[in-house]
UniProtKB/Swiss-Prot annotation:
Catalytic function, reaction form: 2 Fe(II)-[cytochrome] + nitrate + 2 H(+) = 2 Fe(III)-[cytochrome] + nitrite + H2O
Note describing how the cofactor binds: Binds 1 [4Fe-4S] cluster. Binds 1 molybdenum-bis(molybdopterin guanine dinucleotide) (Mo-bis-MGD) cofactor per subunit.
PTM comment, free text: Predicted to be exported by the Tat system. The position of the signal peptide cleavage has not been experimentally proven.
Annotated protein name in UniProt: Periplasmic nitrate reductase
Stored Gene3D superfamilies: 2.40.40.20, 3.30.200.210, 3.40.50.740, ADC-like domains, Dimethylsulfoxide Reductase, domain 2
Example of a GO MF term: 4 iron, 4 sulfur cluster binding
Role played: Catalytic subunit of the periplasmic nitrate reductase complex NapAB. Receives electrons from NapB and catalyzes the reduction of nitrate to nitrite.
Family annotation (InterPro entries): Asp_de-COase-like_dom_sf, CT_Nitrate-R-NapA-like, MoPterin_dinucl-bd_dom, Mopterin_OxRdtase, Mopterin_OxRdtase_4Fe-4S_dom, MopterinOxRdtase_cofactor_BS, Periplasm_NO3_reductase_lsu, Prok_molybdopt-oxidoreductase
Main subcellular location of this protein, as a coarse class: periplasm
Signal peptide (residue range): 1-29
Keyword line: 4Fe-4S, Electron transport, Iron, Iron-sulfur, Metal-binding, Molybdenum, Nitrate assimilation, Oxidoreductase, Periplasm, Signal, Transport
Native source organism of the sequence: Campylobacter hominis (strain ATCC BAA-381 / DSM 21671 / CCUG 45161 / LMG 19568 / NCTC 13146 / CH001A)
Cell compartments where the protein resides: Periplasm
Length: 920
């Protein structure tokens, strides 16, 4: 056995041992008699592992890693091995459930009872049309997902944006990747990473920033381990975190920092480069860059009214910081370049213009970095009070030296520790700042790399554009040219698409609370479990005059607060595709029939589209006092559309779609052909299929958006022959390193000095100014250039106090996925980790007179929960910080968390709020 095989086998065994279970029998399963094996993709994280699925007699009987998959090379993590068992939980939802009274009529205060698909859609249609009539396109909403298949997300976005003329659709990826997205768009002018997972094997240094890769991306972490063991003296690993985790186990340096001070640490590294090691600056690379900055008085993404009637008195103190705040000592230093000092009051005048920015000179950039000395940064950033300041300084110096070392390749990985941050976009931008200064970006083994959390947060949420402001292929609804392109591909009358951004995910919850949204449809996520400050949103769902639909496979918290639950097919019960964190798109075929009467989300979307005629939605629509959408029915007639045609007819069953004929293959396709279950559909009749290859039609129409624009995807059939391809796919070849002329065909086309072309900013200009603001009307040409931002350190809106002395951080664990609705149904995973725990430093437990396993209350200004403490577990927080995962609905930690967001990305900061702890 060679070293690589040994690592694979021991990593799998370790994963199982850590979960307290035996090694799955199918780990090394060979093909068994009567089993049909087919390639597929893992249901869980953004790594995008390839798996092999075995079926027999209509049921999945085994799952194993796909040895031909380039991402995982035959290895799966502990969740991956149970991809089959998540589908067969005892309480799987198999039929629509509606709240009804004793007469069987819909009643918001009634109890759930089974109903037919027809009854479900009848009530859903009635409630939607009531909300639409009262509030128009802004009165309805869809909570989408980074776990949508690409086709599901595309169909949902098309129905909502083209059909209902609403932009109130936003995915739960807003909670995990929005800061990374805005960072990409701000810096590169185009979304998604420039590198790929092969950078792990090609680099000399892996630095993790707020990324517990050992548990959240375990297969990638096995590759990091492999790389470290291949050259232990040369290859260095550094883990930066607010607490010690399993990712620290192989780290050469572990840096525990105070929450939010990662911004200051990046500025320290940049200062070291600019002031003390100018010879390390890659001047050739900087010819492709422009320096920039923006306002600091941008708030924290909370409600603008601290006196909102739904706030408790305890909440108002924190929320007041959205309007203004008194600067701390640390901020007095970091914001001195603006003429501010500690004790000054900063008015948040640019809260609605947080993304505004302008070009500055290198000299201004250098000036802004001046305060970030080793002494200043160490003083504010040291997170472990039991570590000496000198030890911490030495670690910071060693970290900076690793980045600066001339011939050392380096990759910076991050996930939610960066993104779920009230300055999440800023800290994303800063990672590129350092890599750009050194010229260590977009080349093999070098790069700042955002790791996606969900399996298709890239492929669906971002690339398809299921965000409230986006269209496919990085286009946005506010851009007239982008709307024109979209209307042409979708064959819509000009002016159909709403030009005003919808509400983002947290904004939609607030709109429900305020009565602005009256109808909401949840698909492939669990927002009432997953959204911070959850007490507010549960009350909004149950006590306000609205109608909530949840499409789900198990009864999570969101299903329990809904008015109507629709049973959804799960991953291998339908055709689909995901796009992972390295831009790799992967497709799979339907392996088995859905359980009961469950149907795919694509089917649900298309069937709902049948309920609306063009005349119901394409007439004049008032959005607000300043915007009314035009009546487009007359132009629709000139295009050959009948106003009595349904949205299904025009958007999904037109001649283009019907041109994709069914293919005779050995795999089921419930949407195309119907199936042997003979499910009675939305019209009360047995659903016999659409008669055309809907999944292929959706894909081929969708890929039109990216062709020729740097987002090129291959055709549908190609993906079923390969183990995924990294886009842009040009002339049948994938792209591993973007913006690098040696590897990227789009970069090769551009005339720039050197080896790089950041074509996302092609033909763009930027206002010119200084550190204070825009000066005059001059603009800087940033054609084919990336931006290097300066961003200052700022405190989060809520920090520990005498009354609430602890930081609270939330996150995931290896064995469970998100809110646990799937993985908590797997007996082996449940036995391994049956409940969420509060990880606490033993010194804090001793001070509070608590012992291992004691039950405590964790209480914030917003709510409280009971939980057992663990002082000996996998995570070891520093004194003054506790960590609680959020997979367990019985430890509903999001009742405690704060719904502050990054003002640029609107992504929630789940990583820091202030709490008090006492024995229950």
């Amino acid at each position: 056995m060679n070293r690589r095989d040994f690592i694979k086998s021991t990593a799998a065994a370790a994963a199982c041992a850590s979960a307290g279970i035996a090694l799955p029998a199918n780990l090394n399963a060979e093909e068994n008699h009567g089993w049909r094996w087919d390639k597929a993709v893992c249901r869980f994280c953004g790594t995008g592992c390839g798996i092999m699925v075995a079926t027999k007699n209509g049921k999945i009987v085994a799952v194993k890693g796909d040895p031909e998959a380039p991402v995982n090379r035959g290895l799966n993590c502990i969740k991956g091995y149970f991809n089959a068992k998540i589908m067969y939980g005892d309480d799987r939802i198999t039929e629509p459930l509606l709240r009804v009274n004793s007469k069987g009529e819909f009643d918001k205060h009634g109890k759930f009872a089974p109903v037919s698909w027809k009854k479900a859609f009848d009530v859903m249609e009635k409630e939607f049309k009531k909300a639409y009539k009262e509030k128009g396109p802004t009165g309805i909403a869809v909570f989408g997902s980074g776990q949508y298949t690409i086709q599901e997300g595309y169909a949902a976005a098309k129905l909502v944006k083209a059909g209902f003329r609403s932009n109130n659709i936003d995915p739960n990826a807003r909670h995990c990747m929005a800061s990374a997205v805005v960072g990409f768009m701000q810096v590169f002018g185009i979304d998604e990473p420039s590198g790929c997972f092969d950078d792990i094997e090609l680099t000399d240094t892996i630095v993790t920033w707020g990324a517990n890769m050992a548990e959240m991306h375990p297969i990638l972490w096995s590759r990091v381990n492999d790389r470290k063991l291949s050259a232990p003296e040369k290859v260095k690993v550094v883990n930066l975190s607010t607490f010690s985790s399993r990712t620290s186990s192989i780290a050469d340096i572990e840096i525990i920092f105070r929450p939010s001070t990662d911004v200051a640490i990046w500025n320290y590294i940049a200062r070291e480069i600019v002031y003390n090691h100018p010879e390390a600056i890659d001047t050739e690379f900087l010819k492709n860059c422009e320096f920039a900055t923006g306002p600091v008085d941008i708030g924290y993404g909370m409600r603008n009214n601290p006196n909102h009637p739904k706030f408790s008195e305890a909440e108002k103190d924190t929320v007041s910081h959205q309007v203004s705040k008194k600067l701390s000592q640390a901020e007095g230093v970091s914001l001195a370049y603006l003429g501010l000092k500690a004790g000054d009051t900063l008015e948040m005048k640019n809260a609605k213009k947080a993304g505004k920015h302008w070009a500055i000179s290198f000299e201004e950039f250098k000036k802004a970095l001046a305060p970030y000395t080793l002494d200043y940064v160490a003083e504010i950033a040291k997170g472990d009070e039991n570590e000496s300041i000198e030890q911490f300084k030495e670690k910071l110096q060693n970290l900076a030296n690793l980045y600066i070392e001339k011939n050392r390749k380096i990759v910076s990985f991050w996930t939610m520790g960066f993104n779920q941050h009230t300055r999440g976009t800023w800290v994303n931008e800063q990672s590129y700042m350092v890599h750009f200064l050194l010229g260590k970006q977009a080349s093999p083994g070098n790069g700042a790399f955002s790791l996606t959390g969900q399996p298709s947060a890239c492929g669906t949420a971002r690339e398809v554009g299921t965000f409230c402001h986006r269209l496919p292929a990085d286009m946005v609804v506010a851009n007239p040219k982008h709307r024109e392109i979209t209307e042409k591909i979708w064959k819509l009358p000009a002016g159909t698409i709403n030009p005003k951004n919808g509400s983002h995910f947290v904004g939609l919850m607030r709109d429900l609370e305020d009565g602005k949204v009256k109808f909401a449809w949840v698909q492939v996520n669990n927002p009432w479990h997953n959204t911070a400050n959850a007490n507010h949103w549960i009350k909004a769902a149950r006590e306000m005059d609205n109608f909530i639909v949840v499409s789900d496979c198990y009864p999570g918290i969101s299903a329990k607060v809904a008015d109507l639950i629709l049973p959804s097919a799960m991953i291998y019960e339908k055709w689909g595709a995901y796009g992972n964190a390295e831009r790799r798109t992967q497709h799979w075929r339907q392996q088995v029939l859905p359980v009961g009467d469950a149907m795919s989300d694509t089917w649900q979307i298309l069937e709902f589209a049948k309920r609306f005629k063009l005349k119901d939605v394409w007439g004049e629509q008032k959005i607000d006092d300043k915007l009314t959408l035009p009546n487009v029915l007359e132009e629709a007639k000139t295009m050959g559309y009948d106003e009595n045609a349904t949205l299904f007819d025009i958007l999904f069953a037109n001649d283009y779609y019907k041109g994709f004929k069914p293919e005779k293959i050995k795999f089921d396709n419930s949407e195309v052909n119907g199936d042997t279950r003979n499910v009675k559909g939305s019209d009360g009749e047995v659903f016999k299929g659409y008669g055309f290859f809907i999944q292929k039609a959706l894909w081929e129409e969708y890929r039109k958006f990216g062709l020729g624009h740097g987002h090129d995807l291959a055709d549908f059939d190609t993906y079923h022959k390969v183990r995924g391809l990294k886009w842009p796919v040009v002339d049948g070849k994938e792209t591993s390193w973007r913006f690098n002329k040696k590897y990227d065909p789009y970069a090769k086309k551009e005339e720039t000095s050197g080896d790089f072309a950041f074509y996302g900013n092609k033909n763009k200009k930027l206002d010119k100014g200084d550190l204070i603001g825009i000066k005059g009307e001059d603009k800087v040409d940033i054609n084919n250039k990336a931006k290097i931002f300066f961003r200052p350190y700022m405190d989060p809106p809520e920090i520990p106090s005498e009354e609430y002395p602890f930081w609270l951080c939330t996150g995931r664990v290896l064995e469970h996925w998100h809110s646990g609705t799937m993985t908590m149904r797997v007996p082996e995973l449940y036995r391994a980790v049956p409940e969420a725990l509060c990880y606490m430093n033993p010194l804090d437990a001793e001070k509070l007179k608590l012992s291992q396993g004691d039950t405590i209350w964790i209480e914030s200004r917003r709510g409280k929960v009971k939980v057992k403490i663990d002082t000996r577990g996998r995570n070891i927080p520093p004194v003054g910080l506790v960590y609680v995962p959020w997979f367990d609905e019985n430890v509903f930690i999001n009742k405690v968390t704060l719904d502050a967001t990054c003002p640029l990305s609107s992504e929630t900061d789940y990583k820091k709020c202030a709490v008090k702890i006492y024995k229950a």
